[in-house]
């Protein structure tokens, strides 16, 4: 099944809800970055959370999320847009612990760390950016997105993200949900939401069992008839890197740096952090870039 995200209203229009299956997308990220179990889970959760923030944006806006904890994984970066395109990378892809956490799951908190920051940069178009930053509160990532939304954007939310990793490090299931309270929600509605959230199985297990974004939202809303589906968006791993972009980056290094690439290295190889694609520049190509540099 192809990955997709569903946006809907629930609880008499008092909550905005999102759910997504991201299994194929996270499989692609795992393959490109050769991530081990804990790194895969952390990257997949971050990418899925970022996907939800991207889905909240207007058409030409973009979101970049960076989670910098004090764990061995190092910084995790993901970006997404309103079209369901997502990419991401983790600084140390090879983190695996043989011991599971107290809940019998991969110990993502230990990998990410419990001290650090979650920062979000919104590219609003027209060269205008908005940056929000909150401390990491758990290192489990879903709770960290929840805290960011409540603190930085004043939106009471619940974010659940999960990745099920096979013993051979391949991805079995990935996805998540996000629920946001809208102004006017009554205490009764809040109580009902809390009851449904408590009864909800873990996201990765639901997806492994074949649940769809629609069926996850139905569980979240307390029934299919209580949902008003607004939009369905295809989700995929997409990177917009290109040789031209890397050429511009090389030009920005300045003439001296480019001259040293030509004379000492006799060429250059650039690698994209997000997708691991590489771009080779010959001496001749570097000479052309040298002419354009200041």
Curated annotation (Swiss-Prot):
Main location as per UniProt: cytoplasm
Function in brief: Redox regulated molecular chaperone. Protects both thermally unfolding and oxidatively damaged proteins from irreversible aggregation. Plays an important role in the bacterial defense system toward oxidative stress.
Full protein name: 33 kDa chaperonin
Cellular component terms (Gene Ontology): cytoplasm
InterPro entries the UniProt entry points to: Heat_shock_Hsp33 (IPR000397), Heat_shock_Hsp33_C (IPR016154), Heat_shock_Hsp33_N (IPR016153)
Organism: Listeria monocytogenes serotype 4a (strain HCC23)
GO biological process: protein refolding
UniProt PTM: Under oxidizing conditions two disulfide bonds are formed involving the reactive cysteines. Under reducing conditions zinc is bound to the reactive cysteines and the protein is inactive.
GO MF annotations in UniProt: protein folding chaperone; unfolded protein binding
Keyword terms: Chaperone, Cytoplasm, Disulfide bond, Redox-active center, Zinc
HAMAP family hit by this protein: HslO
One Pfam family named in its UniProt record: HSP33
Compartments in which it is found: Cytoplasm
Keyword Hydrolase listed: no
Cysteine pairs bridged by disulfides in the record: 239-241, 272-275
NCBIfam families: PRK00114.1
Family listed: Belongs to the HSP33 family.
């Amino acid at each position: 099944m192809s990955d997709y995200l569903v946006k809907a209203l629930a609880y008499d229009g008092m909550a905005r809800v999102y759910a997504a299956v991201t299994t194929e997308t996270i499989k692609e990220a795992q393959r490109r970055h050769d991530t081990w179990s804990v790194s895969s889970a952390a990257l997949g959760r971050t990418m899925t959370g970022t996907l939800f923030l991207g889905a909240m944006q207007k058409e030409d806006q973009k979101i970049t999320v960076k989670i910098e904890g004090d764990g061995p994984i190092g910084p995790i970066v993901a970006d997404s847009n309103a079209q369901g395109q997502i990419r991401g990378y983790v600084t140390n892809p090879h983190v695996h612990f043989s011991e599971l956490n107290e809940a019998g799951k991969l110990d993502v908190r230990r990998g990410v760390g419990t001290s650090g920051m979650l920062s979000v940069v919104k590219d609003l178009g027209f060269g205008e950016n908005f940056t929000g930053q909150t401390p990491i509160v758990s290192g489990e990532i879903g709770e960290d997105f929840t805290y960011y939304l409540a603190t930085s954007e004043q939106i009471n939310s619940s974010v659940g993200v999960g990745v099920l990793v096979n013993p051979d490090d391949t991805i079995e299931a990935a996805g998540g949900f996000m629920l946001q309270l809208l102004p006017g929600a009554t205490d009764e509605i809040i109580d009902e939401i809390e009851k449904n959230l408590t009864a909800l199985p873990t996201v990765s297990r639901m997806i492994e069992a074949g649940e769809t974004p629609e069926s996850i939202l139905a569980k979240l809303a307390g029934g299919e008839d209580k949902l008003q589906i607004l939009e369905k968006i295809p989700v995929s791993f997409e990177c917009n890197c290109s040789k031209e972009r890397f050429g511009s980056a090389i030009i920005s290094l300045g003439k001296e740096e480019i001259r040293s690439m030509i004379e000492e290295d006799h060429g250059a190889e650039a690698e994209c952090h997000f997708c691991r694609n590489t771009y080779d520049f010959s001496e001749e190509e570097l000479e052309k870039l040298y002419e354009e540099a200041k």
